[in-house]
Amino acid sequence: MEDFVRQCFNPMIVELAEKAMKEYGEDLKIETNKFAAICTHLEVCFMYSDFHFINEQGESIVVELDDPNALLKHRFEIIEGRDRTMAWTVVNSICNTTGAEKPKFLPDLYDYKENRFIEIGVTRREVHIYYLEKANKIKSENTHIHIFSFTGEEMATKADYTLDEESRARIKTRLFTIRQEMANRGLWDSFVSPKEAKKQLKKDLKSQEQCAGLPTKVSRRTSPALRILEPMWMDSNRTAALRASFLKCPKK
């Protein structure tokens, strides 16, 4: 699974996932499923944010081509992917600036158009079950919840999906691709079932020595959102519109 993750995801996403696991004292060599899940969640958060801006009139627009228009403001503030100290600093700054209620748990994004924090979920199970788990944990009407599954299903607070259909379709397509690539490599069952994961871990550890000398193919393209992981007060400097960068898993 670890090899798959390093081949399938952008190196910057992998690096952020490694830092997150290290921060919580988790070993990615052992918790390989969690490593894959964190990378997937990070990518969905970045794809959610990519290309969405607010124009002078306060309208939400989607821009995919390079554009030096300095009057565009990023619609979403990315909180996920930062270390906890910086993440809470960003959240506090948003609350002080916008008057938003401070969430009990760290959210993933802040939507400047709808003036609300967003919790993104990616699940291998039924979307409604995961949604209820998130809602019961957060217990706040001020945090919007949006859940995606690997089967193309989604669920959001009050059926408000925030993004346009095309943007959501990109996310669903990416998740479906990840699932298919895992299945092609015999990893999907272990990703879904902890029991199968233990068996797969043993196989991975045995194969690592055999594959140690092999070259690894990775995509070097960087998601636009990864280039803008900085405090929200620097948002005014992030004026260039962004180019699409949807990563594909290399074939065996």
Swiss-Prot record:
InterPro entries: PA/PA-X, PA/PA-X_sf. The record marks K195, K198, K199 as: Important for efficient shutoff activity and nuclear localization. GO terms for molecular function: RNA binding. The record marks L28, L65, K202, K203, K206 as: Important for efficient shutoff activity. One of its GO terms (biological process) is viral translational frameshifting. The active site is at E80, D108. It comes from the Viruses. Its main location: host cell. It is found in: Host cytoplasm; Host nucleus. The keyword Transmembrane does not apply. Pfam families: Flu_PA (PF00603). Keywords: Decay of host mRNAs by virus, Eukaryotic host gene expression shutoff by virus, Host cytoplasm, Host gene expression shutoff by virus, Host mRNA suppression by virus, Host nucleus, Host-virus interaction. Plays a major role in the shutoff of the host protein expression by cleaving mRNAs probably via an endonuclease activity. This host shutoff allows the virus to escape from the host antiviral response. Hijacks host RNA splicing machinery to selectively target host RNAs containing introns for destruction. This may explain the preferential degradation of RNAs that have undergone co- or post-transcriptional processing. Belongs to the influenza viruses PA-X family. The probable endonuclease active site in the N-terminus and the basic amino acid cluster in the C-terminus are important for the shutoff activity. The C-terminus acts as a nuclear localization signal. The C-terminus is recruited to host protein complexes involved in nuclear Pol II RNA processing. This is Protein PA-X.
